[in-house]
A protein has these predicted regions:
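Bacterial N-terminal signal peptides that target proteins for export
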Residues: 1-10
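Bacterial N-terminal signal peptides
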Residues: 9-19
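An acidic-aromatic pocket/loop used at catalytic or ligand-binding sites
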Residues: 23-186
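An exposure/low-complexity boundary signal
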Residues: 2, 20-23
Length: 186
């Protein structure tokens, strides 16, 4: 009996062990986002279950009009499990301040590699980030107030991406959006 299970059991065990560092890293990132949600000056605007995506567009450059269509100057298309969160930042705190705290933790605690960052006008059009990239029109703010960070975590075969976007329409309307994409391993 044992010999018939062994060929099936060993590859499954090896697969699970190879994904263990990714699961730990992803779990830590989700814990970090949960810490954000639990802060008293944060109100959740949108949070859905993880969804499987194919060829999800990750911006690695400013959004600009190229041959009549809005798109990032540089990008990558990735597939995997995507989790999105959008929060409104309240009580005099700024979305940029919260973004910088999260970014600092990603770099310190997870050795996240920054693949692209922009602030203000260097990001391009805020309305395009809100509508085309994140499909959250509530994120539309002034171009000068926006910030975006794209991070890579993990190693080939067990990677994830974390995207952070902060915007502000006014002092009272500050928003932060986060996306975590756990990549397929093929």
């Amino acid at each position: 009996m044992r010999t018939t299970l062994f060929p099936w059991y060993l590859p499954l065990t090896l697969l699970l062990l190879s994904r263990a560092p990714l699961a730990a890293e992803a779990g830590g990132v989700f814990d970090l986002l949960e810490e954000v949600r639990q802060r008293p000056h944060v109100e959740t605007v949108a949070a859905g279950p993880a969804e499987t995506v194919r060829d999800h567009l990750v911006g690695l450059g400013a959004i600009e009009k190229i041959r009549g269509a809005w798109s990032p100057r540089d990008s990558e298309r990735l597939s995997g499990e995507l989790t999105r969160r959008t929060w409104r930042i309240l009580d005099g705190f700024s979305s940029a301040e919260v973004l910088e705290r999260i970014a600092g933790r990603l770099e310190q605690d997870f050795a996240a590699q920054l693949t692209f960052a922009c602030e203000g006008y260097s990001c391009g059009s805020s309305v395009q980030w809100a509508n085309r990239m994140f499909r959250q029109r509530i994120l539309y703010g002034t171009d000068v107030s926006q910030r975006y960070r794209a991070y890579r975590l993990g190693e080939a075969g067990s990677e994830l991406r974390v995207l952070l976007y902060a915007s502000a329409r006014s002092a009272e309307r500050q928003y932060l959006h986060a996306e975590v994409l756990v990549l397929d391993d093929h």
